[in-house]
């Protein structure tokens, strides 16, 4: 439901682009390896002195029961203040569906100070007609001297028919120095 949980805690390194001009290229090898790269800018131009360009690369390997991806992104910023990100995502799905699949992500950020964030999630793929997912992670990347806040999420997703899935869920976001934010929602997806 929430963006940070949806991108496995590595949205700055893996989820780059889409806000303005973006160009990407990728290739999936037969062996399960894939490589991708791209450039993006929230302004109307890329690779100019005025544009805040973001360059990114990703290498991934996917097998039948697991996958891992390593991503690098460099955001040169409109003022020339460069920020670099490294992200590592991994997932494992056991063959026995009684056990949950696990997904995890870890991201570092360097803009002159080091910050990091993480995510971990579990999904039981066969619970009644649907699946149950739970997850927890930081609400962003934090330096060592910042107060780290977390977000928690739980959802049940089930198909209504061949073209529609309903997903009710709940999330709790910790707020430093304030009341936590709690949300209950229902998402409908069409395919």
Question: Which residue stretches match the model-derived regions?
Answer:
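Conserved structured catalytic cores and adjacent interaction surfaces
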Residues: 140, 175, 183
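Detector for outer-membrane/organellar transmembrane beta-barrel domains
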Residues: 32, 49-151
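Outer-membrane beta-barrel biogenesis signature
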Residues: 1-14, 21, 123, 129-131, ...
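Surface-exposed coil loops of outer-membrane beta-barrel proteins
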Residues: 1-58
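Outer-membrane beta-barrel "beta-signal"
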Residues: 158, 180-191
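C-terminal transmembrane helix-loop-helix hairpin of multi-pass membrane proteins
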Residues: 153, 164-167
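A short, acidic, flexible beta-alpha connecting loop/helix-capping segment that sits on the rim
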Residues: 170-176
């Amino acid at each position: 439901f929430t963006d940070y949980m949806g991108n496995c805690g590595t949205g700055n390194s893996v989820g780059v682009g889409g806000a303005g001009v973006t160009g990407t290229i990728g290739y999936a090898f037969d062996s399960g390896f894939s490589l991708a790269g791209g450039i993006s800018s929230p302004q109307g131009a890329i690779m100019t002195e005025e544009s805040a360009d973001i360059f990114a690369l990703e290498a991934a390997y996917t097998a039948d029961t697991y996958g891992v991806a390593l991503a690098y992104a460099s955001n040169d910023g409109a003022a020339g203040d460069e920020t670099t990100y490294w992200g590592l995502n991994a997932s494992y799905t056991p063959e026995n569906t009684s056990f949950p699949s696990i997904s995890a992500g870890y991201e570092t950020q360097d803009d002159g100070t080091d910050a990091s964030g993480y995510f971990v999630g579990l999904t039981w793929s066969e619970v009644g007609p649907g699946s149950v997912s739970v997850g927890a992670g930081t609400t962003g990347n934090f330096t060592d001297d910042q107060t780290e806040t977390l977000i928690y999420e739980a959802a049940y997703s089930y198909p209504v028919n061949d073209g529609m899935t309903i997903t009710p869920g709940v999330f709790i976001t910790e707020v430093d120095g304030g009341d936590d934010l709690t949300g209950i929602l229902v998402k409908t997806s069409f395919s």
